[in-house]
Amino acid sequence: MAGVSPSTVSRTCKNNPSISTETKEKVRKAMIELGYEVNFQASNLASQYSRTIGIILPASAREVYENAFYLEAIRGISHYCNQRQYMSTVVTGQDEDEILKAIQSMSRSGKVDGFIVLYSRKDDPIIDYLFSEGLLYILIGKATQYTNQTLYIDNDNLLAGEDATEYLYQLGHRKIAYLGSDSSLTFAADRKTGYQMALTKHGIPFRPKYCAEVLNVSGDNTEAISSLLQQDEPPTAIVVSDDILAISLERVCLQNHVSIPDDLSIISFNNSLFARSTSPQLTSIDINSKQLGIEAASQMINHIENPNLVATKIIVPHQLIERDSCCKVK
């Protein structure tokens, strides 16, 4: 009658602080109407865990399976779950409605104990649903909704963006551009802000024409990239928010006879296999994607087995890996 999952009912009975007051009232009203009484003895004797964690991916299937970040994070989650004798299952779809239906089906049937969301986006209806239903979830990425009640694992992407830009500055670059993912993704917005912070610190004016954003890092982004390279005063270095996008940049540079790193230095993020497979190999910020997954799984299982733990946030450190795509300004 309350239209919520069995785990939400269980957590309401235990007065879990992660369940909203509105949801608690809805569940308790339905319990009264049904004449339901909690059997605390049975609850203590019998585990209600399914020992399964749902992993929620973004709606774009192509981008997910081409992006090493998601694959490494899933590898970390699976590795830790196996150690703790939990299972994990992937939830995705062609669009948000399809993902929501899958989440509803899994949670109401008691097939999962909680969800790890592998991305963080502003005004996300999936997060709205998870929170309103009192479902246990953890974000990989910074929480922008229900921040005080949300568990999340993240990098300090502001600092990472600043560090990448500072590295180029120390090589003598002053005409530094930014090429990134859509800023509705919180990691991309923070990396861009970090880039701007580094410019401001050194008194370098921010040039809007030196910034380009793309909706799909694995799509055809030739136009956006060319707009940066064909400026009246072209940049001597570019901070790129993702290794995959940096590979596209290298390809367009090759087509336009722009030499890397002699004409253009490139620094990117994720330190994926792609960064090591290009020529020249990419200097990249390692965000420790697998460790993000491990930490998310660890926190999830801790909160499943100890429901009254308060929401926490964990920051996983990043590391700059120097390779061949950057040099001192000529």
Report each predicted region and the residues it spans.
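Short, well-ordered alpha-helical microsegments
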Residues: 100, 123-127, 246-249
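Short acidic/polar active-site loop segments enriched in Thr and Asp
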Residues: 5, 51, 113, 174-175, ...
